[in-house]
């Protein structure tokens, strides 16, 4: 994930996750590793990271989720000692977010966009946290069968709404944080499990979903809470399951999907 630096005040930083969170600096003549963020330096073993998110309002904040039930919020610092930009990081907070593995984390634009984030995990719940009040969290949704929730995505224009998907589920669940535990919509047209969710960057009522049925579907959800029967646009990848999807942040006419060994750019 590239640093969300719309004003161009930071170096060209790229973060990757796996065993640890790594921050790289892209530039000429090469790309180099700036720092490895490890919160457990006393052990030779690590709990793998499952996901991370870069705060769009404050790019100094990065949140990670892990199979060890925790979420960690990292603070990044950049400086220029001896005419060379350096990047370092420290743990701002680490919390036990779920009863089981945490599979995804995402910052919300609510409340100024800096302090609110949500996570999903193997316990089947969506939980929302506020960095200013970490002594408690809010359970937004719990899967009735306690099926693991794999992904979540916040609405880019209306932070009251988020979407999530359960493991091996053909259905995307739309939630309203003002009405906890009750889905306001279910998007059910996929014929195989859903792998990716992406809200439109320019519209509060459009969302794209992608799955193992080779399909990428765009939905209009403005009629909620009435049932949403069908997507407004559909694309079928001929050669494989769609594994991930991204909606262009600065050029919302474009959506990227990946399947097999291919990446395709679709015009909406």
Listing of model-derived features with the role each one plays in the protein:
Residues 1-52, 58-62:
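Eukaryotic helix-linker segments that join adjacent hydrophobic helices
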Residues 2-10, 52-59, 106-114, 153-159, ...:
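Loop/turn segments within WD40 beta-propeller blades
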Residues 16-19, 64-68, 75-76, 120-123, ...:
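Conserved strand-to-loop turn within each blade of WD40 beta-propeller repeats
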Residues 21-27, 71-76, 105, 126-131, ...:
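WD40-repeat beta-propellers
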Residues 37-49, 87-89, 95-102, 141-149, ...:
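WD40/WD-repeat beta-propeller blade N-cap
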Residues 45-48, 58, 91, 101, ...:
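WD40/WD-repeat beta-propeller blade-loop signature
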Residues 165-168, 188-226:
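Loop/turn-rich, solvent-exposed surfaces of beta-rich toroidal or solenoidal domains
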Residues 243-268:
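Blade-level signature of beta-propeller repeat domains, shared across WD40, Kelch, NHL, RCC1
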